[in-house]
A protein has these predicted regions:
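Flexible, acidic glycine-rich loops studded with aromatic residues
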Residues: 371-378, 383-516
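Active-site neighborhood of glycoside hydrolase catalytic domains
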Residues: 265-270, 280-402, 407-416
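Conserved, mostly hydrophobic/aromatic
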Residues: 50, 116, 155, 176, ...
Length: 516
């Protein structure tokens, strides 16, 4: 259903602000790289002409829609030189920053220039925020030069635990775009649900998308609500969502969990599992023992067939394969898996996982895709239920083109991955997990998160692609409960991803939220 607060966060940032005098400094979210206030104002007319370069028609249409939401009428023109708002592609504008832009409000017009359509789009988001700050349509004259601090500015939504639906996802994409976040990480499969249609394996959604009950209250409560839960996206719906995101310059990175967090898939096709036994899609949350039989070529082929359909759907250059929280018990107890390990000189279960991951990574590379996974894919010991013996690595090393999504373990492991030459995205759970309550991660803690570990050289810093914040869904059954945890903290992560460190100021940021 369409909830009444579909754009509540956008409104909180814009429409209910108090006008500032033109000569005063302006605080935006995220804060631009450079903002120069100039004397004078520009009064927007009731009807606004928008001129655009030929490659910017979709951006111009979106700008027109945004302005109409602010009760302005608009007319679109291709190449009109005297339009009130002018969108222009210019190869000489911030050529080193393809997401960068310049925005100038003069006494005559508003110009947004960039070397890319993405930069133009982000300039439009800044203009939206400025217009929202001045409901009397008297905009201060200014000049903004803006570009992101990090190339990866991500929000992850877990729908494997609770399905939210297309309308909610599109609303979240709108809010991400407004905050200049460019990556939607979509967690579509896990133990408790499979949410993506795979035509070659229809039971993945016929069986895997349904569970008969859900654990409530907290992990290990063993209290269940007794309510069936189901839902999945057809490939048609996914294509529509991808297009919606593309128009907002957001890349969607799908996550298909392997070799663990596989219970829903194994419930659908028991032969995928190491034990080849029938199970139900679990309603209990937490880490489960069922894992794919990575020693079976039929299972490996099935996983590649699944990924083939995923690749055909998602234009993303990056595919996330999960790889987290794999319990090794079934592999250690399986004669078939043990024989496979002996044949391939794999000494430990962690080596087996890295061996499997390398095979998937190489296969994805052959399809023009780059693999990403949670930092267990390096083979490091992250969990108390793992032994040092099981996680010892001798003969297998993760390929250097893999992206390591760092979420847990000793914080030094992030620096270690970078020193070993891997690109990383910092998603350290103590700072970025949106399902944690505000006592655990208050707004200020979220805001001050720095994804760059201390002690890196200049050359090593380039391996930090950026930051992601995660909305895990185990105990987030409703959109309302999700939104309470998501807003306003997502704005803090957005500013961390976009704004230069020198421009960040929590007091100003929090005051901006209060007065908007």
């Amino acid at each position: 259903m369409r909830i009444t607060y579909t754009f509540i966060f956008l409104l909180a940032i814009t429409l209910f602000s108090f006008p500032l005098k033109a000569e005063e400094s302006i605080r935006l979210i995220p804060q631009p790289a450079e903002l120069q206030m100039q004397s004078g104002t520009l009064i927007l007319p009731g009807s606004v002409d928008i001129s655009y370069s030929s490659a910017l028609k979709k951006e111009a249409i979106l700008l027109s829609k945004y302005l109409q939401e602010s009760k302005l009428t608009t007319k679109l023109y291709s190449g009109k030189s005297d339009a009130m708002i002018q969108l222009q592609i210019s190869p000489t504008v911030l050529p080193a920053y393809k997401e960068g832009y310049v925005l100038q409000i003069s006494d005559r017009n508003i110009q947004i220039k960039s070397s890319s359509s993405t930069g133009i789009f982000y300039g439009i988001q800044t203009l939206r925020q400025l217009i929202g700050k001045y409901p009397d349509q008297q905009l201060p004259q200014l000049f903004i030069t803006d570009y992101p601090n990090f190339s990866w500015r991500a929000f992850m939504l877990d729908e494997a635990r609770y399905f939210k639906g297309k309308e909610v996802v599109c609303r979240l994409l709108d809010q991400m775009a407004y905050l200049k976040m460019n990556t939607f990480h979509w967690h579509l499969t896990d133990d408790q649900g499979w949410r993506i249609e795979i035509k070659k394996f229809p039971k993945l959604t016929e069986i895997g998308s349904y569970r008969d009950s859900s654990e409530i209250n907290h992990f290990e409560s063993d209290v269940f609500d007794g309510k069936p839960h189901s839902g999945y996206y057809t490939q048609k719906e996914i294509k529509e969502i991808i297009e919606y995101a593309r128009e907002r310059h957001i890349n969607i990175v799908p996550e298909i969990e392997m070799p663990g967090h596989a219970s829903a898939a194994i419930a659908s096709y028991p032969w995928l599992g190491t034990n080849n036994e029938s199970i139900k899609v679990p309603g209990k949350f937490g880490v489960h023992y069922n894992v794919y039989n990575v020693a079976d070529s039929k299972v490996l082929d099935a996983l590649k067939d699944i990924l083939t359909e995923v690749i055909e759907l998602f234009p993303s250059p990056i595919i996330h394969i999960g790889g987290d929280e794999v319990k090794y018990n079934q592999w250690k107890e399986s004669p078939v898996v043990q024989a496979y390990m002996q044949k391939h000189a794999l000494q430990t279960p962690a080596e087996l996982q890295v061996h499997f991951t390398n095979g998937i990574s190489n296969w994805l590379s052959s399809k023009g895709k780059r693999m990403m996974g949670w930092n267990e894919i390096t083979g490091s010991k992250l969990h108390e239920y793992q032994s040092s013996t099981d996680t010892a690595i001798q003969n297998e090393k993760l390929p250097k083109n893999a992206i390591v999504h760092c979420w847990k373990g000793d914080y030094s492991l992030i620096k270690e991955a970078i020193e070993n030459g891997y690109d990383i995205v910092n998603a350290y759970h103590e700072y970025t997990y949106l399902d944690y309550d505000y006592k655990t991660i208050p707004l200020e803690k979220a805001y001050h998160f720095n994804p760059v570990p201390e002690g890196l050289t200049v050359g090593q810093r380039i391996h930090v692609l950026g930051v992601s914040c995660q909305m895990w869904g185990e105990f987030i059954p409703t959109v309302e409960s999700m939104d309470k945890l998501l807003f306003p903290r997502i704005a803090a992560y957005a500013e961390t991803g976009w704004s230069l460190e020198k421009n960040k100021n929590f007091q100003q940021f929090s005051e901006t939220l209060k007065t908007h």
